[in-house]
UniProtKB/Swiss-Prot annotation:
SUPFAM superfamilies: Multidrug resistance efflux transporter EmrE (SSF103481). This is CMP-sialic acid transporter. Ubiquitous. Found in all the tissues examined including skeletal muscle, brain, heart, liver, kidney and spleen. GO terms for cellular component: Golgi membrane; membrane. The lineage of its organism: Eukaryota, Metazoa, Chordata, Craniata, Vertebrata. InterPro entries: Nuc_sug_transpt (IPR007271). Belongs to the nucleotide-sugar transporter family. SLC35A subfamily.
Length: 336
């Protein structure tokens, strides 16, 4: 088994952060498209459930590759999954919260404009920072707190757009959307930090932890599926309304979820939030190049704030020990 905090290269960390954020940006756009088209609307709860199944299968395959032999693979599953009901119960907490978060994200995107969703969802950054301080007993400097809130303001400006008429008229409930996004923000902060605490508090394999979480996640999401849409699913079918675009959204959600666990393992949840915000800026720039989107003053200012906030957060914290020792020495000299 790998140690709880393995030393990995900076390139690997940057690679994981980059892939995760690019996938997240594509996921938001694709998800919004599938929820606002005039076609038959699929059940979002079934998509969340299928995503959990795919992530479980991929994690099982990666654990098999990590163990290197069928015997060690079976032993690992027997010891850490089948023979560890307490660990399964421990990992059921984030899976339950993540399931709620995913369903709230679907609900919010169905009732809010994509830009409004992205802006309000950035509140997960200070929420995650607060959970990190409270749950992991870490401290953030004043400069880091400033950078966290500066990032929220920057992303808001980047995505600020005047109200426009959409081609597809969809019935929306903004109040319901904002309520859903508030729950999603709280779930994101708590579940992410809780999972980080579990990952880094033992030497258990990342893929074992994922399997433990996704097993309970499948049970939770499957139950939620039939509690929410059971009658309609029985009438129309589990895969009602599914298209290639819907399967693409599920694929993006699965890949993004796996990369997120790797990022949490080797960096932290706050860095994950900063990386996601940077991806929003990059995706907007790509829209300028590909689709002729006009750069606005608010975007330029917001992008600058995002870059500055990332730089400020990444600055090494000043070691005050030597300064305090020097001050104490001077006081002693003066006293003499």
């Amino acid at each position: 088994m790998a140690p709880a905090r393995e030393n990995v290269s900076l390139f690997f960390k940057l690679y994981c952060l980059t892939v995760m954020t690019l996938v997240a940006a594509a996921y938001t756009v694709a998800l919004r498209y599938t929820r606002t088209t005039a076609e038959e609307l699929y059940f979002s709860t079934t998509a969340v459930c299928i995503t959990e199944v795919i992530k479980l299968l991929i994690s099982v395959g990666l654990l098999a590759k990590e163990t290197g032999s069928l015997g060690r693979f079976k032993a690992s599953l027997s010891e850490n999954v089948l023979g560890s009901p307490k660990e399964l119960a421990k990992l059921s907490v984030p899976s339950l919260v993540y399931a709620v978060q995913n369903n709230m994200a679907f609900l919010a995107l169905s009732n809010l404009d994509a830009a409004v969703y992205q802006v309000t969802y950035q509140l997960k950054i200070p929420c995650t920072a607060l959970c990190t301080v409270l749950m992991l007993n870490r401290t953030l400097s004043k400069l880091q707190w400033i950078s966290v809130f500066m990032l929220c303001g920057g992303v808001t400006l980047v995505q600020w757009k005047p109200a426009q008429a959409t081609k597809v008229v969809v019935a929306q409930n903004p109040l319901l959307g904002f309520g859903a996004i508030a729950i999603a923000v709280l779930c994101s902060g708590f579940a992410g930090v809780y999972f980080e605490k579990v990952l880094k508090s033992s030497d258990t394999s990342l893929w074992v932890r994922n399997i433990q979480m996704y097993l309970s996640g499948i049970v939770v999401t499957l139950a939620g599926t039939y509690l929410s849409d059971g009658a309609e699913i029985q009438e129309k079918g589990f895969f009602y309304g599914y298209t290639y675009y819907v399967w693409f959204v599920i694929f993006l959600a699965s890949v993004g979820g796996l990369y997120t666990s790797v990022v949490v393992k080797y960096t932290d949840n706050i860095m994950k939030g900063f990386s996601a915000a940077a991806a929003i800026v990059l995706s907007t720039i790509a829209s300028v190049l590909l689709f002729g989107l006009q750069i606005t003053l608010s975007f330029a200012l917001g992008a600058l704030l995002v870059c500055v906030s990332i730089y400020l957060y990444g600055l090494p914290r000043q070691d005050t020990t030597s300064i305090q020792q020097e001050a104490t020495s001077k006081e002693r000299i003066i006293g003499v």
